[in-house]
Amino acid sequence: MTTSLLLHPRWPESLMYVYEDSAAESGSGGGGGGGGAGGAGGGCSGASPGKAPSMDGLGGSCPASHCRDLLPHPVLARPPAPLGAPQGAVYTDIPAPEAARQCAPPPAPPTSSSATLGYGYPFGGSYYGCRLSHNVNLQQKPCAYHPGDKYPEPSGALPGDDLSSRAKEFAFYPSFASSYQAMPGYLDVSVVPGISGHPEPRHDALIPVEGYQHWALSNGWDSQVYCSKEQSQSAHLWKSPFPDVVPLQPEVSSYRRGRKKRVPYTKVQLKELEKEYAASKFITKEKRRRISATTNLSERQVTIWFQNRRVKEKKVVSKSKAPHLHST
């Protein structure tokens, strides 16, 4: 069936939408005169093409699945003025019953038409919308297709489930210890989205830090620094103030506390120290520097060795004198 809709050129710009509804609500409308229709009524694809292009009596006899309601703009609801010669027409082709659920955009009218109409087809989750204006020398604009997922129906339910799932993604806060497990060598950063931020979550909750080290001693605890006696001492606590003096082993870190393990001197070092002690029991500053350079020991080590050597000799002398005093 081909229906002709005629609009007066003095009417303002209007929009008309097509909504799918039951047959009982599609009977409103007014009949047109000999030249066209002044209102909008129900249309059905089962009507015979031999009827006159009038819109009277088209509602009520059509099934609910094939009927469409033409809801006019509020401007169109006022009584129309008498129409003169038709200024233009828009032809809407209604397809066969098997294709009633899918409507193609209407064909473009002749170039001589000056009165056009705006309408839309919400079929199958999609929306065909046309906005046409009533100008004398303006042709009809092509219809634009809007997918249903981009322009959802306003009657649909709000995406509450989607919002709740998004809220679960931002549940990583420092106070929630059960959300994740802390890893050594990483800092925990909360992922709280801002008001104007991107809605997608950022997966950067763990940021590596180069200078951070997690000290885990094999013979102690993480909360305490413990140094057992079985550990081998790998460095000395004394360092030579001269750049040319190289210590035997690298200096130990200051975080290890406790008594260091005794490191015996080598035979070459002991021989050099005994020779200098035989020459003089007390050393000067120049002599201490020279012994430190030759024995590869620090000046503090040389000084302490001479002190210990004098105490040892004093003990030996005192022990040797003790039996002699008791005998007398």
UniProtKB/Swiss-Prot annotation:
Residues 27-45 have a biased composition (Gly residues). Expressed in differentiating keratinocytes. In the hair follicle lower matrix, expressed in all 3 hair shaft-forming compartments, i.e. cuticle, cortex and medulla. Expression stops sharply at the boundary with the germinal matrix compartment. Keywords: Developmental protein, DNA-binding, Homeobox, Nucleus, Transcription, Transcription regulation. It is found in: Nucleus. SUPFAM superfamilies: Homeodomain-like. Residues 23-48 are annotated as: Disordered. One of its GO terms (cellular component) is nucleus. GO terms for biological process: anatomical structure morphogenesis; anterior/posterior pattern specification; hair follicle development; nail development; positive regulation of transcription by RNA polymerase II; tongue morphogenesis. The keyword Secreted does not apply. CDD domains: homeodomain (cd00086). This is Homeobox protein Hox-C13. It comes from Mus musculus.
